[in-house]
């Protein structure tokens, strides 16, 4: 009888992935530019987040060709094994990977591998061993900490610079397609500030801001459809009444003035619930 390994090698697409078969306690890394994380092990289900190229995740469960993973920020989701490969041990603590990884992090770049194949990487992806940057920008951790300090004006500038023109995509975390909480988490992570992935999680981070008039740049504004309902939207304050956000009602990236009188803005203001200050000195 053929071994599990020999049976797996019968499918050329699964050769590299066959190593995952007994790897429930192992870690994986994304080999695609973006690996969609879904709510169920089914390609037809909803994307809840994304594992970016070079990022590491812990495997919690396996169902057929699907892996239930937990990303470095603790977010769970199902990813098809075609998007990932097993990471050799030892694996560094997940808190030291992802956006805190010392490897060059893409600011939007193109890389070439040892087979001379090129690939575009979005903001937040990691350039891995054997890849050479041939276009765009990528920075190792030490340079990122200097270029992207944990300061309010720098964080808001990054949100506006990198995500301008981005289309709305549920579960997205990059300028290739992003949702409201993805804009927040990616913008803050770039500056070394850890915030949760979802808006309702972000709503319990930091310190409360008593009123909208007290909001400062890089504070977060939270919105819900019902006064006591679950938080469903988040925006980043630019100071005063201006915000930057990824909004379904705007089709994606938008800078809005909450003092405006258009119908969308008036409805948004009605949904405002509270603010939070993530930075100690915003």
Model-identified regions with their sequence ranges:
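Catalytic cysteine-centered active-site loop
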Residues: 167-217
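Hydrophobic/aromatic-rich core segments of domains that either
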Residues: 214-227
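Boundary regions of SH3-family modules and the immediately adjacent low-complexity/disordered segments
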Residues: 1-26, 42, 49, 53-58, ...
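Core beta-strand residues in small-molecule sensory/regulatory alpha/beta domains
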Residues: 38-40, 112, 224
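Short, basic/aromatic beta-hairpin or loop at an interaction surface
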Residues: 25-38, 93-109, 186-202, 238
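Aromatic- and glycine-rich peptidoglycan recognition patches
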Residues: 12, 86, 209, 232, ...
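Glycine- and charge-enriched low-complexity intrinsically disordered segments
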Residues: 92-120, 163, 169, 173, ...
